[in-house]
Amino acid sequence: GHNVIGELVGSEFPDEIITIGGHLDSWDPAEGAHDDGAGCVQTIEILRAFKAIGYKPKRTIRFVLFANEENGLRGGNKYAEEAKAKNEKHIFALESDAGGFTPRAFGFTMSDEQFQKVLQWKPLIAPYGCSEFNRGGGGADIGPLRRAFPTTALGGLSPDSQRYFDI
């Protein structure tokens, strides 16, 4: 399989890239609704919403549906490999790979200075039930990006997972 990529080109800093994504595959015979259908839908919905309101980002935002996360990270590895070959400037990557329930927290892997800036977003997000901002976060698909570009900040969404494995 291949990664599926959509992009909104930045108006002021088009060479600075923010990646948002989830992965297309799941474990057979599971249907993959939470791992990671929800992350794919969330990624597509962010792009759809931005397009619907005519949002023009300052930086380029890439919306990536990664291939083959469950069996070798081929999509994430290829994305990072191609980005490095093109000498792209990836400043932030956010992955949703933990289901589609109510958001409760975000985890971030970034410098102390970046984390202090991100903490300023907390009051904007807390009314939606997402009240925790923690150190350490990211995702399997965006991990290769951090290895290719050590200064790339990573984020991961942590939804309420108490019913993740309910039958």
Go through the PLM ranges and name each one.
Residues 49-74:
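Short helix-loop-beta-strand segments that form the rim/entrance of peptidase-like active sites
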Residues 81-104:
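A glycine-rich helix N-cap at a beta->alpha junction
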Residues 101-167:
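Active-site-adjacent substrate-binding region
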